[in-house]
Regions:
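Sec/Tat signal peptide C-region and signal peptidase I cleavage site
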Residues: 15-19
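Sec-dependent N-terminal signal peptides
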Residues: 4-13
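Cysteine-centric segments in proteins
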Residues: 20-142
């Protein structure tokens, strides 16, 4: 009986923890041990990493050139481009088709808004949980 109560309590805690994540679009733990998160906040996406926190309107973000879900031969690219203070933050990864547990280069690439080469990145730790739930019905799909 105690085991059943313990399992039930654990299930309720786990369920409520996942329920609070319903607005998360992408999250991971960086190789530096810090959380990288993009979540829905009202009509905006909110990017959060370390001390950098900003919002973009969802309707604008999903139409940015770098926001795309592209299915190719063997791989699918998931990317969401957000902008802040003249910088572009492209959050996403590449995934082999048919293997939802493998992530290639997950994280965020940061570049100047004028399409110059990247000036930095946030790399997700591939050994920690990576969560994604991109708005596939809103984003550019190829």
């Amino acid at each position: 009986m105690r085991k059943l109560l313990g399992i039930t309590a654990l299930t309720l805690c786990t369920t409520s923890a996942f329920a609070t994540d319903k607005n998360v679009v992408f999250s991971c733990t960086s190789t530096e041990g810090k959380p990288l998160t993009v979540k829905r906040v009202g009509n905006d996406y909110e990017y959060s990493y370390d001390k950098t926190i900003f919002k973009n309107p969802i309707k604008k973000a999903v139409t940015n050139d770098g926001s795309i879900i592209a299915r190719g031969s063997g791989f699918t690219t998931y990317a969401l481009e957000l902008k802040n203070d003249g910088l572009k933050y492209v959050v996403g990864f590449v995934q082999p088709n048919g293997n939802s547990k493998e992530f290639i280069e997950p994280g965020a690439t940061i570049s100047r808004d004028n399409d110059q080469p990247s000036i930095g990145s946030v790399d997700c730790d591939p050994y920690k949980k990576i969560y994604y739930k991109f708005d596939v019905h809103l984003m550019n799909t190829l």
